[in-house]
Swiss-Prot record:
Family: Belongs to the universal ribosomal protein uS5 family.
Protein name: Small ribosomal subunit protein uS5
Protein species of origin: Chelativorans sp. (strain BNC1)
Gene Ontology annotations of biological process type: translation
rRNA-binding is among the record's keywords: yes
Organism taxonomic ancestry: Bacteria, Pseudomonadati, Pseudomonadota, Alphaproteobacteria, Hyphomicrobiales
GO cellular component, one term: small ribosomal subunit
Keywords: Ribonucleoprotein, Ribosomal protein, RNA-binding, rRNA-binding
Top-level taxon in the UniProt lineage: Bacteria
UniProt xrefs under NCBIfam families: rpsE_bact
Oligomer and partners: Part of the 30S ribosomal subunit. Contacts proteins S4 and S8.
Role, per record: With S4 and S12 plays an important role in translational accuracy.
GO MF: rRNA binding; structural constituent of ribosome
Domain S5 DRBM: 19-82
Record remark: domains: The N-terminal domain interacts with the head of the 30S subunit; the C-terminal domain interacts with the body and contacts protein S4. The interaction surface between S4 and S5 is involved in control of translational fidelity.
The gene coding this protein: rpsE
Length: 185
């Protein structure tokens, strides 16, 4: 016998409650038809669990709430996992680009906070990053900035993966990192 629909809805609400969503940009768009213009809205939303998973989505509808709902659902379908150092910052400096938009991101010491502008800040807040320094170059279009940020985040690698790629032990890589940090200070 089939389960009642209500239980399925409750499960979905519990699963959705673990995510934090941020509206990055809303745009009024117009479709020209025979009788004039038909207005609608396009929304860009970033969704994350603040534990290393994040996604973005784009939704279009005649009303703002419906566009935001569509964008949120789209974002939840395309989540990526980003490894974080100590659960608060990036493992290494990284850059990304999309179209004419470029971003540079650097790991930061505890207490630095999120030093990033506009759409990038929303991505970091939903991702769960607490300390990062980021700079956007080129295009300031929110769509390009978010896509460039995601391009950079996809390039982020855990030190264990880097060690495996180089064919060395993780402890050797960590020891090198320790000496590099000691010489900086």
């Amino acid at each position: 016998m089939a389960q009642p629909r209500r239980d399925d809805r409750r499960e979905r609400e519990e699963r959705d409650s673990e995510f934090v969503d941020k509206l990055v940009h809303i745009n009024r768009v117009a479709k020209v038809v025979k009788g004039g213009r038909r207005f609608g809205f396009a929304a860009l939303v970033v969704v994350g669990d603040q534990k290393g998973r994040v996604g973005f989505g784009h939704g279009k509808a005649r009303e703002v709430p419906e566009a935001i709902r569509k964008a949120t659902e789209s974002a939840k379908r395309d989540l990526i996992f980003v490894p974080l150092r100590e659960g608060r910052t990036l493992h290494h400096d990284v850059g990304g680009h999309h179209g004419a938009g470029r971003v540079l991101m650097r790991a930061a010491k505890p207490g630095t906070g999120i030093i990033a502008g506009g759409p990038m800040r929303a991505v970091f807040e939903t991702l769960g990053v607490q300390d990062v320094v980021a700079k956007s170059l080129g295009s300031s279009n929110p769509y390009n900035m978010v896509r460039a940020t995601f391009d950079a985040l996809k390039r982020q690698m855990h030190p264990k993966d880097i060690a495996a790629q180089r064919g060395i032990k993780y402890s050797t890589l960590q020891a090198r990192r320790g000496t590099a940090v000691a010489t900086e200070e």
